[in-house]
Design a protein with these regions (language model features):
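Glycine-rich FAD pyrophosphate-binding loop
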Residues: 1-15
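FAD-binding beta-loop-beta segment adjacent to the flavin cofactor pocket
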Residues: 232-245
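Conserved FAD/dinucleotide-binding core of flavoprotein oxidoreductases
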Residues: 58-72, 76-81, 117-119, 160-231
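Short, low-complexity Ser/Thr-rich regulatory SLiMs
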Residues: 103-104, 184-186, 239
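Conserved N-terminal helical subregion
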Residues: 21-138, 143-156, 203-207
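Catalytic P-loop NTPase motifs of RecA-like helicase/translocase cores
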Residues: 10-11, 133-134, 232
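Generic structural signal for residues in well-ordered beta-strands
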Residues: 1, 93-95, 222
Length: 245
């Protein structure tokens, strides 16, 4: 296989967290994921559901989905990308490639790139995000992302920043127009936090102002979760592709 990347490099900067299902870990273990430094990943055993006031509602036992060959796992995205780059992608990724057009010739898919190069393949999988131009090329139809009416705020914190939640588990805190997901990403007591907030406009309001008018308005005791370096992204969606070639 070959991966054509539209960017010039892989972003290996320290990133936020990612959750991997037990089955995805089972597959990754086939290329050595189980040999990754144990300090760089975590195996939460439960998903705890809370009200906005941090009163526990119920929990889901994630260990029931585990097997001897795969456990539900959390870690930093950057650690996962580095692992994939070393184990899988080092000789299989070509950068700075953007699709100009495609055509089927004698059962093969011919890909023509903007830089004038081309390739013939049996299968083509497009996975370049909501702002994908490749999807428009394949469908021969313009796809314009639309604002979903929500934003995502992300940060990382230490377990010292929480007291009424179980830092060993995944925590889902549900408010009226927002929810928070908090989970450990390694053995060093680092936690990933993502907060999804309904917001009608995508105006660049200060993050603190958005939080004060939404999630913190319902529970000021959550302030400690947002003392770190906060990053905000508006959430976009786009129409689903319908063509298979």
């Amino acid at each position: 296989f070959v991966i054509y990347e539209k960017g010039e490099i892989l972003n290996l900067d320290e990133g936020f967290g990612i959750q991997l299902s037990a089955y995805s870990v089972f597959i990754l273990n086939k290329i050595g994921f189980n040999q990754l430094n144990k300090n760089e990943k975590y195996h939460p055993s439960k998903l705890d559901f809370y009200s906005i006031n941090c009163n526990k509602i119920c929990d889901l036992d994630l260990s029931k989905f585990n097997s001897t060959n795969g456990k539900y796992t959390t870690l930093k995205r950057s650690i996962l990308i580095k692992f994939l780059k070393e184990k899988l992608l080092s000789n299989s990724i070509i950068f700075h490639k953007k699709i100009h057009d495609i055509e089927q010739i004698n059962g093969k898919i011919n890909i023509n790139f903007i830089d004038g190069s081309s390739d013939k393949v049996d299968y083509l999988v497009v996975s370049d995000g909501v702002f994908s131009n490749s999807k428009s090329v394949i469908e021969k139809k313009i796809f314009k992302p639309s604002y979903y009416g929500a934003i995502a705020i992300r940060t990382q914190i230490k377990t010292q920043g929480i007291s009424n939640l179980n830092s060993n588990n995944i925590s889902l805190i549900m408010g009226s127009d927002a929810h928070l997901v908090l989970y450990p990403i390694n053995q060093r007591k680092e936690l990933n936090l993502v907060c999804i907030i309904r917001k009608k406009s995508k105006d660049n309001d200060p993050i603190k102002t958005i939080l004060e008018n939404t999630i913190l308005k319902e529970n000021k005791n959550l302030t400690n979760l947002f003392r770190g370096d906060l990053k905000l992204w508006p959430i976009y969606t786009t129409g689903k592709p319908i063509k298979s070639i």
